[in-house]
Swiss-Prot record:
Part of ribonuclease P, a protein complex that generates mature tRNA molecules by cleaving their 5'-ends. One of its GO terms (molecular function) is ribonuclease P activity. NCBIfam families: PRK03717.1. It comes from the Archaea. It is found in: Cytoplasm. One of its GO terms (cellular component) is cytoplasm. This is Ribonuclease P protein component 2. The keyword Phosphoprotein does not apply. Consists of a catalytic RNA component and at least 4-5 protein subunits. It comes from Pyrococcus abyssi (strain GE5 / Orsay). Belongs to the eukaryotic/archaeal RNase P protein component 2 family. HAMAP family: RNase_P_2.
């Protein structure tokens, strides 16, 4: 028996955030994933993180840019949490938000194309 899919009106509304890491140090994909999760937990707490549903999508170590997904209602909360992240494993950093979009395709075209994303 095949399960029915939810209609679009009942699905979670997501937004995608493009970010850039400004640092002299290099970061791996796993470090960035942990960084996003820990920054969210530190600022929003467990309940806020559960409601924001941050989800790491992609990271390019060459340009130090990436994409993270979150719930539409908590975009500003997650941006604030990322902004407050200043160090990770002894490495100093700044996370700059490049922009927010409803689709990954538009996010890449509008905010990440200048960094070589296609």
């Amino acid at each position: 028996m095949k399960l029915k899919t939810l209609p679009p009106t009942l699905r979670d509304k997501n937004r995608y955030i493009a970010f850039e890491i400004i640092s002299d140090d290099e970061f791996t994909k796993d470090e960035v994933k942990s960084l996003i999760w820990e920054a969210s937990l530190r600022v929003l707490g467990e309940l806020g993180t559960a409601l924001a549903k941050p989800w790491f999508i992609k990271y390019d170590p060459k340009t130090k840019t990436g994409i993270v997904r979150c719930d539409r209602e908590y975009v500003e909360h997650l941006r604030f949490a990322l902004m407050l992240a200043t160090d990770f494993n002894g490495k100093r950093l700044i996370i700059r938000t490049l922009g927010v979009s409803g689709t990954i395709k538009r996010l890449k075209k509008k905010f990440l194309s200048q960094y070589g994303w296609k």
